[in-house]
Amino acid sequence: MKITQIDEKSVKQAKNLISRVLSTTVENPNNPESLNFFQADTYRFYFLMSFMWEFLAENEISQEYAISLVPKKFASRIKRLQVLKQAVQLGFIIERSSDVGRRRRIYAPSEILLDDFVNYAHSTSQFDQDKAS
């Protein structure tokens, strides 16, 4: 397919999508440290989106559940565990013992990550509104 075969409206929509994604992620100089961490590679970004989806759906997120959120084709089990543990060490994700079993770990976003993510969602929505004006 050649670009000349794509209608003008579709080209404009595609360019708007690219602009929105880049300006609210990797090209955003004001990105907080937490979002930069999760936007460093595809796996981390996929993990962030899946993790926040589950959290916002009020699902309990155990270690096994957290590392199963992203398909295996994106990262090995070791990489998935490393990213989770690194996010905990950096203070982006909070780890606590389960009320049911002491050995079971439960995860939730820290206040920092939650605030950064909500602001990120707001800026993405704001970008869409600005483009519509």
Annotate each PLM feature:
Residues R20-W53:
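Short alpha-helical segments that sit at the start of domains
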Residues S97-I106:
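Short, Lys/Arg-rich nucleic-acid/phosphate-binding segment
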Residues F37-R44, N59-E60, R77, L81:
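Alpha-helix N-cap/helix-initiation sites
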Residues M1-V26, A132-S133:
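N-terminal leader/capping segments at the start of a protein or of a new domain
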Residues A57-P71:
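Short acidic, hydrophobic short linear motifs in intrinsically disordered regions
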Residues V88-S98:
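A short, conserved structural fragment
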Residues F74-Q89:
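Short amphipathic alpha-helical interaction segments
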Residues E111-S133:
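Short, amphipathic alpha-helical interaction segments positioned at domain boundaries
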